[in-house]
Regions:
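Short, positively charged, low-complexity/disordered linker segments
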Residues: 96-121
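Hydrophobic alpha-helical core bundles mediating ligand binding, dimerization, or RNAP-core interactions
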Residues: 11, 15-22, 57, 61, ...
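Solvent-exposed alpha-helix faces
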Residues: 16, 51-55, 107, 114, ...
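Helix-loop segments that flank and shape redox-cofactor active sites
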Residues: 17-44, 66-72, 112-134, 164
Length: 170
């Protein structure tokens, strides 16, 4: 069994959950004109972030694997401009494109994670906020936990839209 098989399964289950929500996402209103800095994300913004964060965290894992001395600096904060601007840009993409990116990035992440051995999973990085973490911890927290949290966020956003639709007269 691959070292990160349980985490990979969590990623696949989360993807399947996101796919089951696709019809509701397609029927949801487009992202508002204002950028999502002072409000909750709508469905398409959440998907845009998931699409952005998968390759980001894979890149950070690769940075740690390639680093000559441990712990290798890695990570970012939620207010980093590149993160925010990517979500701002991609939140208006058509839903089929958001899902195509999800499939592409998630499969790439899964393939790479299944290649890692115990020694690689034990490599350490150092995050400014979280401190030292192994690659296994990064995969667990920054990929698996993270995508599961956003699945819940997406489902809640869609439930909110459905509740608003039901409460409208007519």
């Amino acid at each position: 069994m691959a070292t990160l098989y349980p985490e990979v399964e969590r990623l696949r289950v989360a993807r399947d959950r996101l796919v089951r929500l696709r019809t509701k996402v397609e029927m949801s209103p487009p992202a508002p004109d204002d950028v999502p800095r002072s409000r909750e994300w709508v469905a398409r913004e959440t998907l845009a972030h998931i699409d952005e964060m998968l390759p980001y965290w894979l890149g950070e894992i690769e940075r740690i694997l390639a680093g000559p001395v441990e712990p290798v600096p890695f990570g970012r904060i939620s207010s980093e401009p590149i993160r925010l601007l990517t979500v701002d840009r991609d939140r208006t993409l058509p839903v089929p494109e958001l899902y195509a990116r999800l499939d592409f990035h998630l499969e790439r992440v899964v393939r790479r994670l299944l290649e890692l051995d115990d020694r690689q999973c034990a490599r350490r990085g150092s995050d400014k906020k979280r401190g030292d973490m192994t690659i296994k911890q990064i995969v667990d927290e920054m990929l698996a936990d993270h995508i599961e949290d956003h699945c819940n966020q997406l489902a809640a956003a869609l439930e909110k839209v459905a509740a608003l639709e039901k409460s409208r007269p007519g």
